[in-house]
């Protein structure tokens, strides 16, 4: 997306974003290749453990936390930009292909659906031990003693949070990158994924990450705030009862300490007519989260399937609307240039 012929801009934008969405939907992340986020996670783990061992002072750890966060995010975006830049020197087509693959790797829609489906199958067979084992692969809470309802709740909550963190937020930044051809969609999308990975690895309010991870946690909250609200707003419209669902979200979303996860879970609770939140155990420690939604309907396996449908649908609509807005902006800019030449 670097040196793009303005006349080809709409086509290239559609090819990159549309191709990325299709690639994630059909293939997801092949197990045979190392995902970019895994590499980012390895670097974060090495650097954070080194800082924890070498730095004991509270203020120094906070400063190192800022440095770590900015270094990982900027380096991730720059490396993606450099790869595309060098690829374009070889062939513009190669650069587009790399961007398609790179942006697709930032979308977690396919892997999210697979993870949820891996829990659905044993639940249908009444095999709770296997369902707990599958659930433990993608949630942080203790799963050993969860009841069927708690497994269902944890799965829907994971779909809700990861729809925002792993699907629509990367899409938002990829679309934003399209607006700046010299940057491109992949660098911004992978930079956001780096911020999200930092938050998930060091953004804890417990030692030894309290001081080291504060910056990463706060930054990820800010970066996700707008994409989260846009997703919630669109889900409310897709539900067919926007006024009712929005009222529930406005009531319950702010109850959660997180400025984003409460909203993402509250909208799913509202549109599915269920109740989320409650008591969870993390490494044996009880953590009580606020109850979200009115719980008009029971939590069932069908609710997981419905949550996945909403996840896919809101992604598709945001992709289509985002591209429409971007292409309209580009068309307006081109018209103004043409007018000035007259």
Swiss-Prot record:
GO terms for molecular function: ABC-type vitamin B12 transporter activity; threonine-phosphate decarboxylase activity. The chain crosses the membrane at residues 8-28, 66-86, 93-113, 171-191, 266-286, 314-334. The keyword Cell membrane applies. The keyword Cell membrane applies. GO terms for biological process: cobalamin biosynthetic process. Pathway: Cofactor biosynthesis; adenosylcobalamin biosynthesis. One of its GO terms (cellular component) is plasma membrane. InterPro entries: Cobalamin_biosynth_CobD/CbiB. Keywords: Cell membrane, Cobalamin biosynthesis, Membrane, Transmembrane, Transmembrane helix. It is found in: Cell membrane. It is a multi-pass membrane protein. It comes from the Bacteria. Converts cobyric acid to cobinamide by the addition of aminopropanol on the F carboxylic group. Belongs to the CobD/CbiB family. HAMAP family: CobD_CbiB. This is Cobalamin biosynthesis protein CobD.
């Amino acid at each position: 997306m670097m040196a793009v012929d303005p006349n080809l801009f709409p086509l290239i934008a559609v090819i990159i974003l549309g191709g990325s969405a299709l690639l994630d939907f059909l293939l997801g992340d092949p197990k045979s290749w190392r995902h970019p986020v895994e590499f980012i996670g390895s670097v974060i783990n090495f650097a954070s453990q080194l800082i924890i061992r070498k730095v004991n002072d509270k203020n120094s750890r906070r400063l190192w936390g800022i440095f770590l966060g900015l270094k990982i995010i900027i380096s991730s975006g720059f490396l993606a930009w450099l790869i595309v830049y060098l690829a374009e020197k070889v062939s513009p087509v190669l650069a587009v292909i790399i961007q398609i693959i790179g942006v697709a790797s930032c979308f977690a829609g396919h892997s999210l659906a697979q993870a949820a489906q891996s829990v659905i199958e044993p639940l249908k067979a009444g095999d709770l031990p296997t369902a707990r084992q599958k659930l433990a692969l993608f949630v942080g809470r203790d799963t050993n003693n969860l009841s069927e309802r708690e497994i269902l709740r944890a799965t829907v909550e994971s779909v809700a949070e990861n729809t925002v963190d792993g699907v629509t937020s990367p899409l938002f930044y990829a679309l934003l990158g399209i607006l700046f051809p010299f940057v491109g969609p992949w660098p911004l999308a992978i930079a956001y994924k780096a911020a999200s990975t930092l938050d998930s690895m060091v953004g804890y309010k417990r030692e030894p990450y309290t001081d080291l991870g504060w910056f990463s946690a706060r930054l990820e909250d800010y970066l996700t705030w707008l994409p989260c609200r846009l997703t919630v707003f669109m889900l409310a419209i897709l539900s067919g009862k926007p006024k009712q669902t929005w009222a529930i979200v406005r009531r319950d979303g702010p109850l959660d300490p997180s400025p984003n996860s409460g909203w993402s879970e509250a909208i799913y609770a509202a549109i599915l007519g269920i109740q989320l939140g409650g008591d969870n155990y993390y490494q044996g420690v009880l953590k009580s989260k606020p109850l979200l939604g009115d719980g008009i309907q029971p939590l069932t396996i069908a609710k997981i399937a419905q949550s996945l449908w909403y996840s896919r649908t809101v992604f598709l609509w945001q992709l289509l609307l985002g591209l429409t807005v971007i292409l309209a902006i580009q068309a307006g800019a081109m018209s103004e240039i043409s007018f000035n030449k007259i």
